[in-house]
Amino acid sequence: MEQPIVEFDNHYMLYITTFDDSNNPTGTYFYSSNNKLNEIFDNISNNNLNTNSHLENNARITDAKSDEDNDGINDKIIINYETSNDGIIKAEKKDIKLIFFLKYRLIKQVKLIMTPMIYLDIPILDKGAKNIKLNGDIELVQKSPIISTTITSQLYNYENPFYDIDTKLNSPFDFYYYYNKYKNLNYTLKYNYEKNEQDSSDKLGINIEINIPKLQRVFYIQSIFETIKYAWMQYFYIFLPIYIILYLIYKFIIESNIFYSHVKSDL
């Protein structure tokens, strides 16, 4: 068990749908950290003359981190989304979907590097500006044990991750495919959070606090080299009590003269 090393990866996708009182969609807003994807969404909206689809240029996403015990490993990551878009704020209802990515590393007992996805679906059921706070812990979810090796297991590559969508997405809505694909992986990250909602003056804000566990439980299988490396210790602890018992029996036989000997000593 060890504390994972976690950082914000600065990649995100935001998709907001607004509704009227009868739950009819009135608009869609999209924004991401990928300029190519933003262009695709903008072109789709303009070519289809869909005045209800908008690129959410007012979106502002920032992040911060906290190392409470000064050990060089983040204990908390904070991600903030904020907008002053009237079309979103004044809508009767809205549904906010936010996907962002983290960098996650284990380096001691097992060596694991991955770029996990966090998917949030946040409904807001009334009108007006809001401050929404999410606070929770991340949890490593495993469908199978990790094979412990001396080579780092790269589930995703930082330089060419699966969310590098320049050549993989034909529309902004295809990210559902990648999210469903991500959910089926052997190792994923789950964000267990509580939600608190308050009225605000003029902006819609989402504050996401991610607490990083001090000890992350990991299920893994030892490699054959690791097994051989520590096998002699197991044999030693098994044969040590047997050796002590045999020695005590031998000592008892000698001291009790159970077997007579013809060896004569001049001492």
PLM features: residue spans?
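Non-cytosolic ectodomains/luminal loops of secretory-pathway membrane proteins
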Residues: 2-219
